[in-house]
């Protein structure tokens, strides 16, 4: 499937059928730096909606959450193996950039 930049998608794990999800209750729209990302059953809410944002071409993208004030991107966690979300400080914030690889 081809994807469009800045269009929201739900990202599903093929093996489990579960979706990439920000853990917790965010009904008030508030997201905080460092919140854990996990796999969860489909909820049909913005905690599972992600946009692919082009970052300089060459397959470089950010995966950005729909929920929350500002831009929260999928990010790595230096303390364990779980992914987290983190607010983008600037447009040049490169620690949230990943490279897509066609398989």
Model-derived regions: residue spans:
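Lectin-like carbohydrate-binding module/patch detector with strong preference for beta-trefoil
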Residues: 1-103
């Amino acid at each position: 499937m081809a994807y469009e930049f800045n269009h929201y998608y739900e990202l599903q794990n093929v093996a489990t059928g579960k979706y990439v999800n920000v853990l917790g209750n965010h009904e008030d729209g508030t997201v905080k730096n460092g919140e854990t990302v996990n796999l969860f059953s489909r909820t049909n809410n913005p905690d599972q909606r992600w946009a692919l944002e082009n970052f300089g071409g060459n397959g470089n993208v950010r995966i950005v959450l729909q929920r929350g004030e500002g831009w929260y991107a999928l990010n790595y966690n230096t303390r364990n193996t779980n992914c987290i979300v983190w607010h983008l400080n600037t447009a040049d914030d490169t620690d949230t950039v990943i490279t897509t690889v066609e398989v």
